[in-house]
């Protein structure tokens, strides 16, 4: 047999030593020169720090409508990160479209909210009807709560939301090719200052007010964290202040609990009241840097805050803390305090084991104060008017006031500022115009998806921190969804379980597997009550964070309070 010269040479091998080494060739994905140049053009002179990874991914996603493999590799090279790290982060967040090269998604994406309030208003029918109405160049996908439950059903064309959506209104929105613009229906800096705004902050910075005095007023008023946990605010400030400097400050504007939209309500109307409270809190704990983490579903508010923060800085109102605005990317889990910190640092939003708590080891490894938007919104009023202004309000032996996000089967849904301890029956009749026509009140969610479900027979319980726990429920973020005789309680619990299944970060097995198994058991045939109870207990007792621990609350409440529903066929909307 005659060999070619190349093969013959190869067979001779090296004269001495081991086997011949193959010629060196590059391994792995090779950088695309054009993609590198495109990424560089988007980043310009922005820092290539790890904590800015999600911000940079947004730049590419916003410009091209997706994240290609070539752009991810180019971004990894620019930031001197492993491609696997960039890929893991990009694929963790639902608002990033990671695609193969040459396989981009349709140019327009329509997201249909199918969380409970929107499902009750016809989201399922929208998901069925829209693809045929919009055509092949539009992608229709389901999405979690968009923070506009009082306008259900809600769709987002790109990043612009359509309220009380119909196939016709969504088609018109697609045709108009909308783009998000800065929100402009709020009280601006000049008007806020004219009404006395930032006077308290100036008094704090000038020494007219002491940190201890401000903490005492806030503590005496009984202000608690209004994002869901309800931890006493003054105590939290004192705990963080006791930790060594430098301390950090992180603001949670990522309200993603289904049924919750009160932070959006206040930010759209009076953002500087929130910003002044935030700057006072930063002064109290002496935080040289403050990070605001806002959900991606609120693009108009994000753009508005960028403008207002620039005005604050120009006016010299924030000399004590550097302000950063960070953008979420569609992950409910980032509402959990440590997951949010991971996301601000440019990582996947995975909750951290505790201890240590974020007040001890938080953002960038430093002691960190973390607060919700509404908590900070009330700081100015409480300190200026005194603790008595708060404690003089309340009902049923509770003190203070609460902002309730009310949606579902009422005539007038919306944010209702009501006395702490108000009952859901009072909330419906006095604040929400009564039940919607043709609906009979049968049950309610007192605290969003996580807070459980209670029957109409328990509608006279005070709604406040600590009043519902013995019934297997809690008020959490005060998101109240009203249910009627038109709603199947099994379908309600299934909708919420599917939400948790979708939003589980996947880090721990009890939550990842438990939510999936529970959803399958709940949607297929008669409920296996014994197995569902056992599964719920495992999720509650062994999950790392509050998502898995609370995911079974609606399920267990239906088993406990609505036994007559269990024998009926599943009836969706």
List each language-model region with its residue ranges.
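Short loop-to-beta-strand transition segments
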Residues: 236, 290, 433-448
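Hydrophobic alpha-helical positions that pack around
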Residues: 302-420, 432
